[in-house]
Amino acid sequence: MSTRPVLLALALLTAGCREAPDPSPFPDPQRPVAPIVSPRYSNEDPRDSAGEFEKVVELAGIQPGMSIADVGAGEGYYSVRLAPLVGAKGRVLAQDIVPQTRDALAQGLTRERLDKVAVKLGLPNDPMLPETSFDRILLIHMYHEIERPSEFLWNLRPSLKRDGSVV
């Protein structure tokens, strides 16, 4: 008996024995993911005249003394408006994944002396927020840009306080 067919059969069998790559524990989104076009959602005037901030604050139940994370803060539309609202006992954390946007926001906050707002750089699929820290986490005009939403939300959850919520 020739060893050639046996070796060929063994080669074919072992070729299929490579370890499969680990599948992601998170499913891919079943939707298109929008690119990050700009750190600015739209002109502030139309947002202000529509009462956007006031509506969000009311529906989210944001009160003085709360800790709020503004994820995907961009230029800080919400962050700068939340600072006086949360008052002396509250705090605001503005988070973004684009270093230049984060830096520009930090400079603007320093210039305006809004020391109530801290600025943090996050990752596309992990906002890198401290655990058990926030009463509300705002995801305003940015969720459609998240490439892996299940993973993002999984990483976001530990940062909520017991009765906290995502808006």
Model-derived features: where do they sit?
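Bacterial N-terminal signal peptides that target proteins for export
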Residues: 1-7
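C-terminal motif of bacterial Sec signal peptides marking the signal peptidase cleavage site
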Residues: 14-16
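Class I SAM-dependent transferase core
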Residues: 18-69
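Short glycine-centered segments of the SAM/dcSAM-binding site in methyltransferase folds
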Residues: 67, 91, 163-166
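Class I SAM-dependent methyltransferase SAM/SAH-binding core
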Residues: 69, 74-127
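A short glycine-rich, Lys/Arg-flanked "PGG" loop and its adjoining helix->strand segment in the class I
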Residues: 83-84, 150-165
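A short acidic, Gly/Pro-enriched loop at the edge of an enzyme's catalytic core
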Residues: 127-137
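A short SAM/SAH-binding and catalytic strip from SAM-dependent methyltransferases
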Residues: 135-149
